């Protein structure tokens, strides 16, 4: 053993050297910081007061909450939005001392909020932005998919409880409103709601991620949303960004191969939610137990609820109608209301006078906010409750561009005795004809070749990146209203068109695709589009001459023909029946127009490509699995239209 001094000498030497250095370094006076510990800015010119608080939940997690109170407010109702999209940004759309100015933007019907004198509250959900806790996409209710004692229902309850006890300017009445994911959260609030929750407005809500909202449609994966998944789930503050080096998104997705391979290339396997998507391609218990329409069908209807549906919603076109159908039969006291508007996703809070090339003759969104949303909120959130009651259903009728006030949905007219809805077959007949009514032609078929190496694009190329910034050429929200004439001439699209209409054809409700089709492969996708073909010349708006406007369209993945939870190979070259619903429509095909149906087997890159050979999980399809297939659409196929007819005397 070495002497102890030998072992400590290096340490002592180092310490002494440091001491000597400190002794030789000149000591300067400190330079005070020019940043105050807390900045108290001038607020005399502001017509609102903003407070930021961390509200504790029952498990101790604190959620970042921003409260904006009109200056001088007393006995004001509270309008709450819970969001994963950054609460701070939603009350900071502009740098201004004016309340309406800072609220004008996403998730805020600013005119209604300000005119109503409401206290605006925005909260980050757990795990996002300023809130504590762990983020789980569409966190399920406590149960088999969520063993914890907390979910969005309990978090909303705890938040409302805190708000009514800690905001002295309020009258203790709370409403909850939101769009998309933020529209899903009001639905969760309806499960065991807080007594102070007096009204809910779910707008374009996420409801069933497999059947027809964000993640799948009838089993076909919406790979266009992969950028959203990455940006939303891999960081707390959405700091990771999806990138592309391609001018055309079509090329980016083609070069990657399968959606699973693209996910691997982008590192999505690090995300728990992505791994759930990949592990649950069928409609199994994972999806069924989260479907909000199924959940709410088992709940009593106690809170007045206004569901808002956009007829050209590119993201959540299934949800609002599905919830309405689920809960309306249990509505004994007239608490369930519905709006259908001619908008894109979230379009009810924007300018609603136009949609792409379409002109509606008035600002439809402004009408809805002032004539429907404003009195609806006032009736339940104000102390006097003197606002007029709204109609059970307020539906915009496209084609005629008229608002209709109805007693229920679907309903052909305000007086349900004056008309009736009758299912009428639009036959896909020989000679590329669409024939309304009459007997089916059981002979023959139309044929096309579907090539996964050249899938049908979902819109005209080049396809801009998914996004909402029109200044950057991102027109994703309005693609459903794109002109479809480019696709009616393709050899891999079967097109059927009616004769010119001599009388109007009005439809209200859900068209049903009823295909008899075969494929030379062992799996196939079927896309059906119902289209209004404008006359070749439209004097009032020349740009609409010959326009082919999608009224309703969707996709069905053939492997689920015998059961949505049981994928099976298709029998090759055998005519098989496929029946699936298309999104709700409320439209009049006018005289001089024609009705068209397009059928195809890809819709790319909106949906991932079907390899057309059966594989256990398409996410993991290999390059050799993708093969051409010959598709036949038999003339016994039809689209069942919900036609409004005058009732028999």
Task: Please identify what each model-predicted range represents.
Residues 71-166, 214-215, 350-360, 490, ...:
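Cap/lid segment of the alpha/beta-hydrolase catalytic domain
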């Amino acid at each position: 053993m070495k002497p102890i001094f030998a072992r400590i000498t290096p340490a002592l030497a180092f310490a002494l050297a440091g001491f000597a250095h400190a002794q030789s370094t000149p000591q300067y006076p400190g330079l005070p910081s020019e940043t105050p510990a807390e900045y108290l800015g001038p607020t005399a010119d502001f017509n609102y007061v903003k407070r930021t608080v961390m509200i504790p939940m029952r498990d101790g997690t604190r959620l970042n909450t921003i409260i904006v109170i009109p200056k001088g407010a007393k006995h004001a109702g509270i309008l709450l939005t819970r969001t994963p999209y950054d609460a701070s940004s939603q009350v900071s759309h502009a740098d201004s001392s004016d309340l309406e100015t800072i609220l004008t933007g996403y998730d805020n019907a600013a005119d209604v909020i300000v005119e109503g004198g409401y206290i605006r509250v925005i909260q980050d959900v757990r795990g996002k932005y300023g809130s504590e806790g762990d983020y789980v996409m569409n966190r399920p209710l406590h149960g088999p998919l969520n063993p914890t004692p907390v979910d969005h229902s309990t978090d909303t309850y705890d938040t409302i409880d805190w708000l009514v006890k800690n905001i002295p300017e309020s009258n203790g009445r709370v409403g909850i409103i939101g769009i998309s994911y933020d529209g899903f959260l009001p639905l969760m609030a309806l499960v065991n709601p807080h007594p102070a929750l007096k009204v809910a407005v779910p707008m374009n809500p996420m409801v069933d991620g497999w059947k027809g909202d964000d993640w799948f449609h009838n089993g076909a994966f919406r790979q266009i949303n992969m950028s959203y998944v990455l940006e939303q789930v891999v960081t707390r503050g959405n700091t990771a960004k999806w990138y592309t080096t391609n001018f055309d998104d079509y090329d980016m997705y083609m070069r990657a191969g399968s959606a699973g391979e693209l996910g691997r290339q982008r590192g999505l396997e690090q995300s728990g939610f992505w791994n759930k998507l990949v592990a649950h391609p069928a409609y199994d218990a994972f999806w069924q137990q989260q479907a909000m329409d199924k959940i709410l069908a088992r709940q009593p209807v106690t809170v007045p609820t206004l569901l808002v549906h956009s007829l050209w919603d590119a993201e959540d076109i299934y949800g609002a109608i599905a919830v309405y159908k689920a809960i309306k039969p249990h509505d004994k006291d007239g608490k369930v209301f519905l709006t259908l508007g001619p908008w894109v996703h979230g379009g009810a809070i924007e300018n609603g006078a136009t949609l792409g090339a379409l002109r509606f003759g008035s600002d439809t969104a402004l009408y809805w906010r002032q004539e429907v949303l404003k009195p609806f909120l006032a009736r339940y959130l104000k102390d006097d409750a003197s606002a007029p009651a709204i109609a059970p259903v307020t539906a915009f009728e496209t084609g005629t561009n008229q608002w209709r006030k109805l007693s229920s949905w679907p309903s052909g007219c305000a007086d349900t005795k004056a008309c009736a809805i009758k299912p009428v077959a639009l036959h896909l007949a020989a000679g590329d004809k669409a024939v309304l009514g009459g007997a089916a032609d059981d002979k023959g078929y139309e044929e096309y070749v579907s090539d996964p190496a050249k899938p049908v694009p979902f819109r005209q190329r080049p396809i801009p990146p998914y996004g909402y910034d029109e200044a950057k050429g991102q027109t994703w929200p309005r693609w459903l209203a794109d002109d479809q004439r480019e696709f009616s001439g393709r050899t891999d699209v079967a097109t059927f068109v009616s004769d010119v209409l001599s009388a109007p054809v009005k439809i209200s409700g859900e068209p049903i695709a009823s295909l008899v089709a075969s494929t030379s492969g062992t799996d196939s996708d079927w896309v059906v589009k119902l289209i209004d073909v404008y006359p070749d010349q439209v004097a009032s708006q020349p740009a609409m001459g010959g326009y082919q406007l999608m009224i309703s369209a969707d996709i069905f993945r053939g492997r689920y023909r015998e059961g949505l939870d049981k994928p099976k190979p298709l029998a090759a070259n055998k005519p098989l029946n496929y029946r699936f619903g298309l999104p709700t429509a409320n439209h009049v095909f006018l005289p001089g127009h024609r009705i068209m149906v397009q059928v195809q087997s890809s819709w790319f890159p909106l949906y991932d490509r079907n390899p057309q050979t059966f594989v256990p999980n398409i996410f993991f399809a290999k390059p050799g699995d993708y093969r051409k297939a010959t598709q036949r659409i038999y003339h016994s196929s039809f689209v069942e239209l919900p036609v409004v007819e005058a009732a028999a005397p």
